[in-house]
Amino acid sequence: MARFGQPQARCRRCAVPSPAGVAECGRCLGAAPPVDACHAAVSYEYPWTALIAQYKFNGQAGWARNFATLMRSAPWVEPALEQADLVLPMPLSRQRLAERGFNQALLLARALAPQKTDAGLLLRVRHTTAQTALDRKERLGNVKGAFALDPLRAALVRGKRIVLVDDVMTSGASMFGAAQAVRQAGAAVITAIVLARTDEQ
């Protein structure tokens, strides 16, 4: 599967496609996101849109390992995983987990770094409307206050290098909301790793 993922120049902070040689996009230069780096394996376009939909919504949980191999093929992902102290999957609300039957981000995280993945440290404390039908401003408001760390174990991230894992990143609202919660708990370095990134922020 990795051979079908073509390398793409991307903003180092949000992974949106950018011209070769441009380290950061204009949006990130104007307002730096709460992640230090963001890496994406592929653009969220056909055939990846269809494959990811099958993975998430049609019970193809077994595809996680192949997708993780694809993610590892992206530049800088291997070093980020090697240097990480903890790998945290983006959490689902209880309602979404019940609908889907599994957390696709958790399966990816475990396939990427089984010894470093902590499934219960980052929590989604509020169920949110599905982001797909919302514009950027609405998405940012939708996830505000939706993420928190387990208060009994939040100190585990203090001064540590944290990797956040998700399958798809669109506006970045969910990823950055989660990263903000991790940053507020004292994480030293936060890197986001996603399977697919949309071409627009």
Show the residue positions of the predicted features.
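Glycine-rich phosphate/pyrophosphate-handling loop used in enzymes and phosphotransfer proteins
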Residues: 1-201
